[in-house]
Amino acid sequence: MLIAQNWVTGLLGHANEGWKVPSSDLDSGYVRVGFETEGYWPIPETTGPLVFGRVETIEELTEFKKPIRHCHVNVGDANGTGELQSIVCGARNFKEGDTVVVSLPGAVLPGDFAISARETYGRMSAGMICSASELGLADKQNSGIITLDPSYGEPGEDARQALGLEDTVFDVNVTPDRGYALSARGLTRELASAFSLTFTDPAIEPAVAGIEVKVPAVEGSLINVELREETKAIRFGLRKVSGIDPAAESPFWMQRELMLSGQRPVNAATDVTNYVMLLLGQPMHAFDAAKVTGDLVVRNATAGEKFETLDHVKRTLNEEDVVITDDNGIQSLAGVMGGLTSEISDTTTDVYFEAATWDTITVARTSRRHKLSSEASRRFERGVDPAIVEIALDIAATLLVEIAGGTVDAGRTLVGDVPAMQPITMKVTRPSELAGVDYSAETVIARLEEVGCTVAVSGDTLEVTPPTWRGDLTMSADLVEEVLRLEGLEAIPTIIPTAPAGRGLTDAQKRRRAVGHALAYAGYAEIIPSPFMDPEVFDVWGLAADDERRKTVSVLNPLEAERNVLSTSLLPSMLDAVKRNVARGHNDFSLFGLQQVAFEHGSGVSPMPSVASRPEESVVAELVDSLPNQPLHVATVGTGNIEFEGPWGKGRAYTFADAIESARAVARAAGVTLELANADALPWHPGRCAALLIDGTPVGYAGELHPQILEKAGLPARTCAMELDLSALPLVENLPAPVLSSFPALHQDIALVVDETIPAEDVRAVVEAGAGELIETVELFDVYRSEQLGENKKSLAFSLRFRATDRTLTDEEANEARLQAAELAKEKFNAEMRG
């Protein structure tokens, strides 16, 4: 949150006379009570003569393309002559008699903009009438000239101090659980704790903010408001101001606080609502009362209902969105943004101020659903104090009458009660037990009361009732946190615990790490697949309706509307990564990912037990049963070349064989042996897909992806992939170390003629088994077909490497092992040895 230093120090200075600290100390104060600052910066400096002026005459110059005004401005004796200053200006939002801010020749404005006397538009211009953006108070959107009440200063007096140009803006990082701190009220409360100051709550005593509330005693209701239970809304209030001057502008002091907090001044009524929000943390909305017809109903929208918000976007609503409606239709998207139909305009004379307390989750979902984050929604989704609806309405009404005239109606609509805060029981010694620091009972009680809690003491037990603005305090651990942070986290000693003996990675963790290392060593780059996916990808793949991968688990509050289920396969995310990389000009790469997937399992409905104590075993069992099945999968994908052309020879494309080899690398790292079999499984090519088996049970697939699926998805042709259920592999606790031999190896080849239908992998496995203990490796290096071999016949040539661990092998021993392998192949497949 952006907030000016002078605002918070001014609020604190009301009860702590003379208190003032440097910006660096204020920054440290925020940090001391647990609030980081993203940074702080002074308002850019203006040097040279910057004075108040009074516009005496305005000459309209109409002979130019845009309207130009030649002004004579009274700047007193600041120009050295006492004569009126001649200034040419293009702004239109000031008139004769207005008090303005003038930079005279010799002044240098922010951005090194030097002011000098020069002729422009045929007139001499000796100075500039300044806007807020030119003085560094706002961005270029706030380009209007600053017009002031004459009480700010006489013509010729220095304007810096009166305008508050010697100030510093802080950007305070407010965490989601501390919504109360998105206001001057919340931040000054924290700073009072940081500097041991007296805090006066502006919601109780508005005088600390310079506001004297003047509203008539409440007599009756304004209009009827129906707050339907389905909306989960807590409170709703209305107050009316009638007969305001629609041309009135908010005063500079208010505009200044708004601009330094990142808000854009709009009109008097809107500026008042934004100021009250920044002061108290209560978002408000101003309706043009003339455009509101009949009673108001706060209800859930009908699916498909249309509504145009203040940002001129026509939105299609969801049945979970909460709306405020009158007889004419929807007037506001509750807690997020108002509508155009009842917007404050330059003809508005009667205003309804609305302040409410909305359900945090409902507002958060609506904001995310419509991609519409506003200052109001940021506060409502973090929690707003339900007890300040009345004072917010009264302050807003008071300020608007002061600014724009009119009267506050005696009627007030208020629906809903302030919810009772639930007391929390805590041992007074609990903070000391958790922090390892001795906190006295007096310290614990004082810190909790400083937060705003009511504390009842019974022996060594405290019954703590949180204040209405601290909805985040729900259990004793929250109270402990408050004591620790206010006493100073730096007071807690850093003690490294002694590691228990015999602990380390589990066997499953070791396997996961080994698999990751093996694939990285094989040249694959690791990515982190998304745990969410779009289920429509399975329609593109053409999966059957009963395919296991369609048993997805829906996400109630998805980050993206399209990716609304938990992934049952890593391939959709892996292929998205391929598509992104190819779009960026990377065409040759191979990736791998290790991630859990989730399959629907059990009841699917999780109970919501209290976190105050350990739930019963039956509840734990119900929780476990409701969880989805979450096996660990590993996947690889490759496209383009795996070897590049160069002086060493031609390059080689990544093929389905490489995808299968990646599965073998996983198996070796896991200490198991995979069996291969031909398979027809989507999204793979039916003729270039291998099933990965353990004891005859499929645990995954590898191969080239189906060309039609690749085309539909916009992926490169011949992209290959592998996915394997790592959790389905038997866990080998202690992988056997490889046997190393210092004796030389013998190499022999064998070629076997078999039927075309027999897989080469099956023949390879039989050759390895038949060769006995002396065989070290069996590798297929050639497949040959010809008329001489016969129809539906093929020749498979294998390279055999033999080695003994205790001696040098003879050719006779290797030949005998080779012949034994051929005999077993003949027995199993009727294979004939060639050559």
UniProtKB/Swiss-Prot annotation:
Cofactors: Mg(2+)
ATP-binding found in the keyword field: yes
GO biological process assignments: phenylalanyl-tRNA aminoacylation
GO cellular component, one term: phenylalanine-tRNA ligase complex
Cofactor: binding details: Binds 2 magnesium ions per tetramer.
Stretches assigned to the tRNA-binding domain: 44-160
MF annotations from Gene Ontology: ATP binding; magnesium ion binding; phenylalanine-tRNA ligase activity; tRNA binding
Location of the protein in the cell: Cytoplasm
List of residues binding Mg(2+): D472, D478, E481, E482
Keyword terms: Aminoacyl-tRNA synthetase, ATP-binding, Cytoplasm, Ligase, Magnesium, Metal-binding, Nucleotide-binding, Protein biosynthesis, RNA-binding, tRNA-binding
Alphabetized InterPro entries for the sequence: aa-tRNA-synth_II/BPL/LPL, B3/B4_tRNA-bd, DNA-bd_dom_put_sf, Fdx_antiC-bd, Fdx_antiC-bd_sf, NA-bd_OB-fold, Phe-tRNA-ligase_IIc_bsu, Phe-tRNA-ligase_IIc_bsu_bact
Residue span, FDX-ACB domain: 741-834
Record field: catalytic activity: tRNA(Phe) + L-phenylalanine + ATP = L-phenylalanyl-tRNA(Phe) + AMP + diphosphate + H(+)
Enzyme class: ligase
Database matches in SMART domains: B3_4 (SM00873), B5 (SM00874), FDX-ACB (SM00896)
Alphabetical list of HAMAP family matching this protein: Phe_tRNA_synth_beta1
Quaternary assembly: Tetramer of two alpha and two beta subunits.
Family, as annotated: Belongs to the phenylalanyl-tRNA synthetase beta subunit family. Type 1 subfamily.
This protein's name: Phenylalanine--tRNA ligase beta subunit
Native species: Corynebacterium glutamicum (strain ATCC 13032 / DSM 20300 / JCM 1318 / BCRC 11384 / CCUG 27702 / LMG 3730 / NBRC 12168 / NCIMB 10025 / NRRL B-2784 / 534)
Gene encoding the protein: pheT
